[in-house]
């Protein structure tokens, strides 16, 4: 009985020592005491346990990670400030976000330091604005997707039928084939221009290209794109003129010969 009571007493003492050791380590961590004092306490506790273990039954040894006190005190010299370099790169980057500015609008000094990015950013804004305006204006004028293939198919076969008729008529009536072919082609393209006048292409690509070019060339392209509708109208008028001349040549063949 004495042996059992002695073993129980030793176990209680070991538990109390462990509890004291855990409380001391937590206090040292909070107060930031030196690691030398904590290491001496750990050694003293280990020596006391070694003395008690001589008279007690063998106990499984505890791991060294539990016995050795970790130094959890904060040391500013050992901290690696890796994010500082990333923060510096973020500060010098033109894509950084300004949380204190409304709607995260880039500051003006970013455009002064990066002129290439300024041109690219302005081109993106202009192209997005033109694309939204074009979609808004032509929203009610776009052809449905179901009827678009049918429209292209009709134009294709109408063009083929007209050219076939011209070739047959010129062959049997001994008419010059080349002028009449050009006349019919001009007529067909004129009708296509008249029907598709409201579905013109977008000029956002030319605007983006003009923003990336040097000032003289960019201004020239922007100035030229403003006259694209007039060029389209001139081409349409030229096609209609050729068609009228073809009709005159048909009724008055003496104009050709």
From Swiss-Prot:
UniProt keyword terms in alphabetical order: Membrane, Phosphoprotein, Transmembrane, Transmembrane helix
| GO function term, MF aspect, one | membrane insertase activity
Q: Where is this region: Disordered?
A: 16-68
Kindly list the positions at which Phosphothreonine occurs in this protein.
134
* Superkingdom of origin organism: Eukaryota
What Pfam families is this protein classified in?
GET2 (PF08690)
Q: Which GO terms describe its cellular component?
A: endoplasmic reticulum; GET complex; membrane
Record membrane topology: Multi-pass membrane protein
Residue spans of biased composition, Polar residues class: 26-37, 54-63
- List residues traversing the bilayer: 160-180, 231-251
Signal sequence span is none
Tell me one GO biological process term: tail-anchored membrane protein insertion into ER membrane
User: InterPro entries per the record?
Assistant: Get2/sif1
Q: Which residues carry this modification: Phosphoserine?
A: 35, 132
Q: Where in the cell is it found?
A: Membrane
Partners and quaternary state?
A: Interacts with kms1 and sad1.
In Swiss-Prot or TrEMBL terms, this protein is called Sad1-interacting factor 1
Q: Which organism is it from?
A: Schizosaccharomyces pombe (strain 972 / ATCC 24843) (Fission yeast)
């Amino acid at each position: 009985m004495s042996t059992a009571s002695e073993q129980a007493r030793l176990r209680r003492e070991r538990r109390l020592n462990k509890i004291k050791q855990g409380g001391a380590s937590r206090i040292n961590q909070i107060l930031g005491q030196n690691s030398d004092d904590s290491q001496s306490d750990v050694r003293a506790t280990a020596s006391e346990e070694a003395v008690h273990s001589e008279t007690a039954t063998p106990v499984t040894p505890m791991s060294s990670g539990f016995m050795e006190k970790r130094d959890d005190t904060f040391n500013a010299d050992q901290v690696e400030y890796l994010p500082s370099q990333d923060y510096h790169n973020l500060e010098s980057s033109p894509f950084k976000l300004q949380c204190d500015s409304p709607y995260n609008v880039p500051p003006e000094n970013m455009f002064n330091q990066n002129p290439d990015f300024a041109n690219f950013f302005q081109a993106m804004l202009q192209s997005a604005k033109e694309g939204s305006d074009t979609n808004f204006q032509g929203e009610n004028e776009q052809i449905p997707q179901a009827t678009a293939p049918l429209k292209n198919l009709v134009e294709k076969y109408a063009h083929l039928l007209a050219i076939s008729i011209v070739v047959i008529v010129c062959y049997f009536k001994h008419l010059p084939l080349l002028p009449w072919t050009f006349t019919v082609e001009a007529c067909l393209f004129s009708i296509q221009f008249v029907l598709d006048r409201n579905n013109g292409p977008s000029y956002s690509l030319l605007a983006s290209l003009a923003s990336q070019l040097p000032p003289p060339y960019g201004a020239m392209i922007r100035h030229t794109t403003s006259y694209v509708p007039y060029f389209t109208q001139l081409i349409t008028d030229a096609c209609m003129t050729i068609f009228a001349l073809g009709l005159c040549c048909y009724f008055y063949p003496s104009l050709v010969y």
